[in-house]
């Protein structure tokens, strides 16, 4: 191998290492989001607020409405209180450029009426799909979908 080839090979390996490091950092940043549900505390809430950009937005449908990070932190407290046995598991993560897709699972038993249904102690076990957009190492947007139709069926005993 000549000097040029050695230099090119070293540069390629160096760039690959940098890219892998950046991807690992992005995945860690995304995981910080989920800790507000899996390990709720003032520290995890503060960590999420730190990794989310000032104009972070969460979209759950095509209405054009979105939720801001402070509102999500407040709502997450209510979710965890209403479903104290909530188990949230990341089943898979995939990064493509500035986007990280997360496939996850939520299992919980609501403490009362939920989505117009009295679950009578029944739990739900559903899939969630989230797409996070990052810019300069910060979360900027989230698009998410949860399988609430399955949750409603499970809670109604059907």
Question: Model-predicted segments: where are they?
Answer:
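Bacterial N-terminal signal peptides that target proteins for export
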Residues: 1-9
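Bacterial N-terminal signal peptides
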Residues: 9-17
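Sec/Tat signal peptide C-region and signal peptidase I cleavage site
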Residues: 18-24
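Short acidic-aromatic low-complexity motifs
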Residues: 24-55
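A solvent-exposed, acidic/Ser-Thr-rich amphipathic alpha-helical stretch
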Residues: 46-97
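A short hydrophobic beta-strand element
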Residues: 98-110
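Exposed beta-sheet edge and beta->alpha loop/turn motif
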Residues: 108-135
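Short beta-strand edge/turn micro-motifs at domain boundaries
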Residues: 125-153
């Amino acid at each position: 191998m000549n000097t040029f080839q050695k230099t090119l090979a070293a540069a390629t390996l160096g760039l690959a290492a940098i890219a892998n490091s950046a991807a690992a950092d992005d995945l860690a940043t995304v995981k910080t989001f989920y800790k507000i549900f899996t390990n709720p505390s003032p520290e995890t809430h503060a960590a999420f607020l730190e990794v989310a950009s000032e104009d972070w937005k969460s979209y759950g449908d095509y209405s054009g409405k979105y939720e801001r990070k402070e509102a999500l932190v407040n709502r997450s407290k209510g979710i965890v209180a209403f479903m104290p046995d909530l188990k949230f598991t990341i089943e898979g993560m995939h990064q493509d450029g500035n986007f990280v897709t997360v496939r996850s699972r939520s299992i919980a038993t609501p403490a009362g009426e939920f989505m117009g249904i009295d679950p009578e102690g029944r739990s739900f076990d559903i899939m969630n799909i989230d797409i996070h957009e990052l810019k300069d190492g910060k979360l900027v947007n989230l698009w998410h979908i949860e399988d609430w139709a399955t949750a409603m069926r499970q809670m109604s005993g059907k």
